[in-house]
Amino acid sequence: MKFGHNAIRVKDIDVMLRYYVNGFGFEEAFRIFNDDSSLRIVYVHISNGQYLELCLGGGDRPKFDDAASLGHRHMAFIVDDLVKTKSELESRGIVFDSDIMNSRDHNLAAYLFDPEGNKIELVQVGSGSPHAKFESH
């Protein structure tokens, strides 16, 4: 079994597509339509069979400000070089909510929010992290 997609409900598909395609460099893969031919879902290809599913029909959402709330907290993307990736994304207009930091799991991390408030983490896996140790066993 492997991870397939993360689905997020969106209000403005055009803004979100520009953000993830133009900003992050991901590729729009395909679209799914309703019976009345209206757009329902846009799949954005991330890597190796992994997608971000942008589902139309989002309303207002509460601001993410309660780390103790149950449910989805953030989505994370693994990068090889966080300093380089952060710089490239910033050159494309992506704004970060944090500087690069050392996380408790011995990785480098930086956080940002997409235009509709979904929290994103970029992670550079450290050689001494539990992630690296687990993957190497």
Model regions and ranges:
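Short hydrophobic/aromatic beta-strand element in the GNAT-like acyltransferase core
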Residues: 41, 76, 109-110
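Vicinal oxygen chelate
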Residues: 86-137
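Exposed loop/turn and edge beta-strand positions of beta-sandwich/beta-sheet ligand-binding modules
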Residues: 38, 71, 106
